[in-house]
Amino acid sequence: MISSSFEGFRYHKPLPNFYKVENPKNPNNEIPEDLLSYFNELVLKYNFSGLSYSKLSEEFKQEFNIDFDNVIIIKFLMGDNLIKMEKSREKCRLMDDEFQDYGIHVYEFADFLRENGFQADLIHPLADDLSMRAIALQSNDCVITRSNMCLFKDGITVGFFIIHTSIENLPFKSENDMLWVEDFCSTCGVCIDRCPENAFDENEKFQRKLCTAHREGCNDCLLRCPFYKRGYDKVKRRYDRMVKR
C-alpha cells in the first residue's frame, strides 16, 4: 500500500520529495561489483524485474538540456490481472495505483545509494520536458515496437522508473542486440489489423491521439502481440528460424 504521506506522481506537478537520506556532498563515482549485485537483489526483493543502465550521449544531453550522464532504469512488470481487465476508467485507476505502489520503493533505492556515498535522484516519471523512453533507448537494452511500446527482454508489459546517479562504472551496453525486432514487426502487423480505434494512419504509423490506452486502459494490441503471448525468447527463436529459410 502507498504511504498516506506520499503525494504520488502527477502530470504537471513537482516531483514529491520522499527521500529520507540527503545526497552526499562529495559523491563517489565507482561502485564495487558486490555492492551493485546487492543493489540488484534489493530491487528484485520488491518484485521489480531488473535493472538496465544508460550512459547518455552529449547530443542527447544537449537536446533535452540536462547535465547528468549516468542513469539506472528500474523495471517492473505490470500485473497480468490488470492487463487482462476490460478497458474502463476503473482499470486506469488501478493501473495508476500499481504504478504509484512501485514508485514509492524507488525512493528507498535512491536512499540506499545515497547511504553508500553516491548521488542518486529520481527523474520525474511523468515529466513534460524529458522523454523517459528516449532515456531508456540510450541503454541499448530495449526497442520501440510497431505498436509504440517499449520492449525490454523482460517483457512488453514493462513499466520503469529512472534514477540518475554519480556512478560512472555501471555495466553499460555499447550495442543493441534487439534491433531485429523492427524487421519482425514488419512481418507481423497484428497490432494494426486488430486495433479497435484504428490508431494507425494509411502508412501504418501509430497515431497517439487516437489511442485510448491512457484514457480507458485499452491494450488490445498488447494482448495480441507475439511478445506478450509467447515472450521475447520464443519470438526470437521463431525469427531466427524464419531468417534461415
Which residues are covered by each model-predicted region?
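Non-catalytic, usually N-terminal nucleic-acid engagement modules in DNA/RNA processing proteins
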Residues: 1-91
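Catalytic cores of enzyme domains
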Residues: 61-65, 69-70, 75-245
